Amino acid sequence: MSNVTTLLDAKSVPEAKAALVCPSRNETYSYKKLRDEMNRIGFGLLSLGVKKGDRVCICLDSSPEYLISYFALWRIGAVAVPTNIIYKGEELLHVINDAGAIAVITDRQGAGVIRSIRKDAPALTHIICCGGACDGTLAWESFPPAPENMRAANCSTADLCHIQYTAGTTGKPKGAMLTHGNWMTALDTERDALRLTPVDTYLGIYPMGHVGLSWGLAVIRAGGTYVMMERFDLEHYLALAEQYEVTILAGMPPVIHSLVHAAPGTEQRLKHARVIISGGGGLLPVVWEGFDKRYHIPVANSYGLSETIVIGSGTTTLPEYPQLTKNYQSVGVAVGYTELKIVDTADPEKELPFGENGEVAIRGPAVAGGYWNLPDATREVFRQDGWFLTGDIGNLDAEGILCITDRKKDMIIMSGWKIYPTEVENVIIRHPAVADVAVFGVPDERKGEFPVAAVVLRPGAALTGAEFEAYCRNHMAGYKVPRNLIIVDSLPRVHGWKLLRRDLRQKFGGSRS
């Protein structure tokens, strides 16, 4: 049987051991309690008529109920469709209708939004509400215990279990179709890449509606303990790392940046950590180098997408690749059974030589089967030979080490020159007045496009256009220098880290002042 939830049936893990800890609610789920809750909710869904292959949306904040919902749906062979409690009605309606969801699991806040759009969601039959029922919903707490003999649905590796809607950085979200086989491969790969064991404790901060959840599931797959945070707060993060003697830290670029600039003595508070994971966006070399020199904790700078359940490559500190720990530009080597290659952006059939920039392509058993209800979009990037075109620009060296340069859609072409925004940002972020930066292209009748920089200044700092231009010209070729400096209070990011250059182009695309 290939049902991914069989990871909770392992006899090698003591049933009383903590699998999931939610410190904000002072709740601990042992492996037995987590399995019992999974079966209870799964059995309740079966009693409502949810069957194998049916799609069910999860609309919750990160919580034990979110994780249990995944497991319960997978247990009965249904398909989890994760969303986020911050979605507005129109965003939720798109996902619910596109997926054809027959039920939604939410809380009292989300129930109000869903009830307001229910009339426009013809397939939606049930709203299950955590925290007590309200009008038109069923209470999560009302489902009775499952029979003792309840077992996982018989699923194959090819059976769909998850539709992960992309963040929509290039338009309307697309649903990546993920299977039990995809998930089992990803969890085993992540477990092996980080050499996870039952003694590991993981501090997770990735939103549970995001495939970054897989790191927490990989720790459970290894028999360890997953300590969850609903949202990042530096002091709380450090306190939990100390209290639970955390060995595996979840990090995103903003988290690692915060740690670089944290108070003296913070190093001691992370003394149990043996690795920190970075994912979900590019980690600037200056930030990585600063973290490395201060903490001496290896950074697993991972690369992947919704379409690959995170897994593509990673700078895991394997003995055979010691150089990864000091290559601050790299996202490492292909992990597990994943294959990587670089192809021509105009002709994906043409593989490029080592060191040359092109589109990153990934092939392997964790790669999604395509996009839900979008055959044309599927054919465009999921090739018949199994290669997935990521839309990211990068290069491979002779040792198989991957460096991501930029997004294909973000590349700026000015008078025939190719400008990679991330490369320019890596220079600008080193300016002492700059806290955050985004470089993007705007149309120009004569040159096609030209680069613009939106900059967030450090508190109390100032930066004039002339100073900015002089700095850039001293550190990069003239054609790469942004033609305009825009000072902003913040940059648009998904989940707090993935940059939405599209929003900047829409807002400032006509500005040259």
Regions found by a protein language model. Give the residues of each.
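Conserved AMP-binding/adenylation subdomain of ANL enzymes
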Residues: 184-201, 208-248, 262
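Conserved beta-loop-beta connector loops within the AMP-binding
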Residues: 337-361, 380, 398-399, 461-465, ...
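Conserved AMP-binding A3 loop
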Residues: 28-32, 161-185
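AMP-binding/adenylate-forming catalytic core of the ANL superfamily
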Residues: 87, 93, 104, 249, ...
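Conserved pre-ATP/AMP-binding loop-to-beta segment of ANL
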Residues: 16-18, 129, 145-165, 172, ...
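ANL superfamily adenylate-forming
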Residues: 24, 109-157, 262
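Conserved AMP-binding/adenylate-forming core of the ANL superfamily
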Residues: 19-63, 67-71, 88-93, 181
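Gly/Ser/Thr-rich phosphate-binding loop
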Residues: 221, 246-250, 260-326, 339, ...
